[in-house]
Amino acid sequence: MKLRWKIAQFFEAWWWRRYLKGKPLPEYLAWKRQYWFDFLKKIDVAVPPKASILDAGCGPAGIFLVFPENPVTAVDPLLAQYRPLFTHFTDGSLRNIRFVEQPMEQFVAPQQYDLVFCLNAINHVADLDLCLQRLREATRPGGSLVLSVDAHNHPFFKRVFQWVPGDILHPHQLDLSDYQQRLLAHGFEVKRALMLKQEFFFGYWVLLAS
């Protein structure tokens, strides 16, 4: 799995460089902020102004962009590769955010957070169970986890993708029940499961847990 994870990380960084090539950065960031506002509205999650937030597997333009009044910790192993692509990492515009360049498995939270986001990231990691343990440790009692992931629709294709890396960016190929059971095993209670998008192979799900 470690080799597969390293390959996935390489192609993740490559994908972002290719995706952003020729795109006006201000327009992209404006679109991304609106995407996150719409996402929060769809899942009916309100964020109090001073609530502490962890954005685990934040990527270069994660949900950390839309919380200027909150203390935020944003963690990702590829931040060094994202910095040359995005000015907000170096221009001082995100002073409320502490960026941590680290795999989620190695991140030991310095505090517990009111709200933990792990969006489009959990199926990118090397050690799924260790990452879920880290998320559990980072979520304060009474706090919430918001986890989004592409989950397989069909058992047959799930097995095919597990054996043959047809989805190179995502080392983990699981279905919704698999993710729910893993969360339960790590002490989370899943409050809601919302499907935001349905395609042939995958459904895009948001799991809200505490």
Model-based region annotation:
Residues 129-144:
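A short glycine-rich, Lys/Arg-flanked "PGG" loop and its adjoining helix->strand segment in the class I
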Residues 1-45:
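Class I SAM-dependent methyltransferase Rossmann-like catalytic core
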Residues 120-121:
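Short catalytic micro-motifs in class I SAM-dependent methyltransferases
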Residues 117:
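A conserved beta-strand element that flanks and buttresses the S-adenosyl-L-methionine
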Residues 146-173:
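Conserved class I S-adenosyl-L-methionine
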Residues 54, 58-105:
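Class I SAM-dependent methyltransferase SAM/SAH-binding core
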